């Protein structure tokens, strides 16, 4: 037998293995490449959710409650926290109501959103930085009377109804708030 007849099957095997490895490298490498990068956008480091409706932006939406047991029981009241921003330079808006499947939401205070202005709903516990001076008409309160038990780690559906912008639906998490560090 000539040496070409002996090494030809070995060469074909090597070429096939090398081709297979090259194909697998390109397939697996292509899984991470794409037109939309998963790390190209920055997300806010806040506890709450967010939603944008036309020129209105609702940010850091969360239920603020300290949970000591397995659930926050029905009948209890908890605070709904958020910041509403009106990005329109021409149109004022007003938060008419908030509804949820976990209970009734009572809005108290001035709920008008001025042009290019903000509306704070609730006051954050444990704020380390003093906020800029706010007028009393920039702060409202939303109190949720629970109709069913809720717990940390889950989100609950809320609908925000605005006079001009319409409705925005968002899943709102329960924020445990500031608690002493466990040791």
UniProtKB/Swiss-Prot annotation:
| One term under GO cellular component | plasma membrane
Lipidation (S-diacylglycerol cysteine) occurs at 31
This protein's membrane topology, according to the annotation, is: Lipid-anchor
Looking up InterPro entries in the UniProt record yields: PCuAC_sf
- Renumbered to this chain, the positions carrying a covalent lipid of the kind N-palmitoyl cysteine are 31
Q: What is its main location?
A: membrane
- Does the record's keyword annotation contain Signal? yes
Signal sequence residues: 1-30
List the keywords (alphabetical): Cell membrane, Lipoprotein, Membrane, Palmitate, Signal
Keyword Lyase in annotation: no
Q: Which domain of life is it from?
A: Bacteria
Q: Where in the cell is it found?
A: Cell membrane
Q: What is this protein called?
A: Putative lipoprotein LpqE
Query: Mind giving the lineage of the organism this protein is from?
Result: Bacteria, Bacillati, Actinomycetota, Actinomycetes, Mycobacteriales
Gene that specifies this protein: lpqE
